[in-house]
């Protein structure tokens, strides 16, 4: 049981790849250590293909164990349950660059499992997990055109930073993850603070250059301990069958792709496909042969669409390569929501709703690095009817979680700070029609709904999806791609941003040979399309946000001395409970003394604020108060000045004349005017009533006299 290790310095920490000791029954298993973050990645592939399988069943599961951070799971069962959003997003992040590197027609089931076993709070486990998956596949013998490397790139003070720590990410203007083979970038995922195109492209190139050391280390590991490659070869093309399908359907497919309506085009293609299958499938045809016919038909579709575009012919819906589909914008479409927008771009449509809440509505996330609150949520839903299909409705799928996260990244850079706008914000994008680029429609609709709700965004944000088709030296970059162009093309390239720069970038490339120059052209063309959409958005809603929705809660923010927090809360929470119940508000108090009062009416909020001010007010020397007599003593009286603030009115300070009995001048419950003479270093307050009463003349008869207010003045 000999462990083989490869250790390199990668960025600010050492990266170690270790295999041969743990999980030896997997086809490939690598323990990746990066700083104190440790991830075990295993790969298993099935040698036999399931009968009738017509797609590649790759499964990637990234899982975080709470013991990795020295924690015990919360809840009743005390064990890890369903995947968190972070686990789902990281699973997708690993899957996306791996999937294009398996051979075409390889349909054996492959499962990648990445388990976080130790978590350094400064080092995210996603980069080690991608590297581990690449290394495990490289040594497994499973057909795989890797390995790949991965890098996180930050941008701090005008400099690129390789694999920035969690602390550095708080300062960075960019958080970009790039994965690539030795020669080609495959995947980019990023969010940025309105950075220009050349900085974004430079970060991709920088990350690709830096990860070469990782790819070399994986190659060395595979050369040393790699298993015998599988005896697998792609099936020989059935030229006779291809010719038959082309003869039966080629011309008809060509005509079908001149139909601009998606539903009409799909119906026509279904009809052609059914006719071809009907003519070529007999009772003796096996499932695998039937699947081969379907695959040939699909490849023929791709050939038709790609050749039309590369030959300079109009695209499927009649556009040229740079034109954005017609756009329709409506805001305020739902009467009782806080903000809403209907964004339609061609046959893609998003109904997006913004809701404002108080601090109590923040999402509490129990992450490995510790618990934190998220004040901005964006949820993306795409029901089956959006594509004219039936299907399951309910729990969001991985794709929906990923698209929601991308749209959220795009809008984060323009949100007002907590101090500027104290609301919790939730945006929900309901995709009601889909024919390409629904996540970018969610960005546009999300921005519009936030403006409709009255959120003071720093700038308008729009998103656009780009595509690419490449055959040899012929390249076509497509603006605002359709679903078919995404499916049949070589690249899906989503860019969101403001007039000033990019806020989110996501790229998935299915082929090699995409150069930096091609990416530069795509980014430039995307900017052109983005600015066009931003112009239409501003035309529709103007530059400024609407007034805050009348249905949104009002939030009043005030600041008190942190030492007074306990006075506002009261013993056992009695004071704050009474405040919220009597005023109908919600009150959130932070450790620094910031208080946020959430209310449905301004009057209720002001009443709560007034009462908190009274509770936290300080007694000032020389000030006059209307005090209530709480208790009579032999030597004076205890007078309440403010909630929780009492003072002593000494018998000598009640009146100018001699006072033999306090009860002759005061009674409990009486309201009297008193002046604060002194507050000593222990907080004791000395009061005077006679200081507010004119001294009697020498001839005046002696009688009880004390300044009274309100009902006490008789």
UniProtKB/Swiss-Prot annotation:
Residues 622-690 form the S1 motif domain. Pfam families: KH_1, PNPase, RNase_PH, RNase_PH_C, S1. Residues 553-612 form the KH domain. One of its GO terms (biological process) is mRNA catabolic process. Its EC number is 2.7.7.8. SMART domains: KH (SM00322), S1 (SM00316). Its cofactor is Mg(2+). It comes from the Bacteria. GO terms for cellular component: cytosol. It is found in: Cytoplasm. Mg(2+) binds at residues 486, 492. PANTHER family: POLYRIBONUCLEOTIDE NUCLEOTIDYLTRANSFERASE, POLYRIBONUCLEOTIDE NUCLEOTIDYLTRANSFERASE 1, MITOCHONDRIAL. Belongs to the polyribonucleotide nucleotidyltransferase family. This is Polyribonucleotide nucleotidyltransferase.
């Amino acid at each position: 049981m000999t462990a083989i290790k490869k250790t390199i310095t990668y960025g600010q920490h050492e990266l170690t790849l270790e295999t041969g000791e743990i999980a030896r029954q997997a086809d490939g298993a690598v323990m990746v250590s990066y700083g104190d973050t440790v991830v075990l990645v295993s790969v298993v592939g099935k040698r036999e293909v399931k009968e009738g399988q017509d797609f590649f069943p790759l499964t990637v599961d990234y899982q975080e164990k709470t013991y990795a951070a020295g924690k015990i799971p919360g809840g009743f069962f005390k064990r890890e349950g369903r995947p968190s959003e972070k686990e789902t997003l990281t699973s997708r992040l690993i899957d996306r660059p791996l999937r294009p590197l398996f051979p075409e027609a390889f349909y054996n089931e492959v499962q990648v499992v990445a388990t976080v076993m130790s978590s350094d709070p400064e080092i995210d486990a996603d980069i080690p997990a991608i590297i581990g998956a690449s290394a495990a596949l490289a040594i497994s013998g499973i057909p795989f055109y890797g390995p790949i490397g991965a890098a996180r790139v930050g941008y701090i003070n005008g400099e690129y930073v390789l694999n920035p720590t969690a602390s550095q990410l708080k300062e960075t203007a960019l958080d970009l993850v790039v994965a690539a083979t030795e020669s080609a970038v495959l995947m980019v995922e990023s969010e940025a603070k309105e950075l220009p195109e050349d900085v974004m492209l430079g970060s991709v190139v920088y990350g690709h250059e830096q990860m070469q050391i990782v790819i070399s280390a994986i190659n060395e590991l595979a050369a040393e301990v790699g298993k015998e490659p599988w005896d697998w070869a792609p099936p020989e093309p059935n030229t006779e069958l291809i010719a038959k399908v082309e003869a039966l359907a080629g011309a008809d497919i060509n005509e079908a792709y001149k139909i601009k309506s998606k539903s009409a085009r799909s119906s026509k293609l279904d009809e052609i496909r059914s006719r071809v299958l009907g003519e070529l499938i007999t009772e003796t045809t096996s499932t695998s042969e039937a699947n081969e016919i379907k695959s040939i038909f699909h490849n023929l579709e791709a050939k038709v669409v790609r050749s039309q575009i590369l030959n300079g012919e109009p695209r499927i819906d009649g556009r040229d390569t740079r034109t954005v589909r017609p756009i329709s914008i409506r805001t305020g479409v739902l009467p009782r929501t806080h903000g809403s927008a209907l964004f339609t771009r061609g046959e893609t449509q998003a109904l997006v709703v913004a809701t404002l809440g108080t601090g109590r509505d923040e999402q509490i996330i129990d992450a490995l690095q510790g618990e934190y609150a998220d004040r901005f949520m964006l949820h993306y839903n795409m029901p089956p009817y959006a594509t004219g299909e039936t299907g399951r409705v309910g729990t969001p799928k991985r794709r929906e979680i990923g698209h929601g996260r991308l749209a959220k990244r795009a809008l984060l850079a323009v949100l007002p700070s907590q101090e500027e706008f104290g609301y919790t914000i939730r945006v929900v994008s309901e995709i009601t029609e889909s024919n390409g680029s629904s996540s970018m429609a969610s960005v546009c609709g999300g921005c519009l709904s936030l403006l409709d709700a009255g959120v003071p965004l720093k700038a308008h944000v729009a998103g656009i999806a780009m595509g690419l088709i490449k055959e040899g030296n012929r390249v076509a970059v497509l603006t605002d791609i359709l679903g078919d162009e995404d499916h049949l093309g070589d690249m899906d390239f989503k860019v969101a941003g403001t007039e000033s720069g990019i806020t989110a970038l996501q790229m998935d490339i299915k082929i090699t040979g995409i150069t930096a120059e091609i990416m530069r052209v795509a980014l430039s063309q995307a900017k052109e399309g983005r600015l066009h959409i931003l112009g239409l958005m501003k035309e529709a809603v103007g530059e400024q946000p609407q007034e805050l929705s009348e249905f949104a809660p009002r939030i009043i923010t005030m600041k008190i001395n942190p030492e007074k927090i306990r006075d506002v809360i009261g013993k056992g929470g009695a004071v704050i409970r009474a405040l919220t119940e009597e005023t109908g508000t919600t009150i959130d108090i932070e450790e620094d003394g910031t208080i946020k009062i959430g209310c449905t009416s301004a009057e209720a909020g002001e009443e709560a604020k007034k009462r908190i001010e009274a509770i936290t007010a300080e007694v000032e020397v020389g000030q006059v108060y209307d005090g209530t007599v709480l208790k009579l003593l032999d030597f004076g009286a205890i007078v309440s000045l403010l909630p929780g603030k009492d003072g002593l009115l000494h018998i000598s300070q009640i009146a100018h004349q001699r006072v033999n009995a306090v009860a002759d001048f005061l009674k409990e419950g009486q309201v009297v005017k008193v002046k604060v003479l002194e507050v000593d270093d222990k907080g004791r307050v000395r009061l005077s009533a006679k200081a507010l009463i004119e001294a009697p003349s020498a001839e005046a008869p002696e009688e009880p006299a004390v300044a009274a207010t309100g009902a006490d003045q008789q």
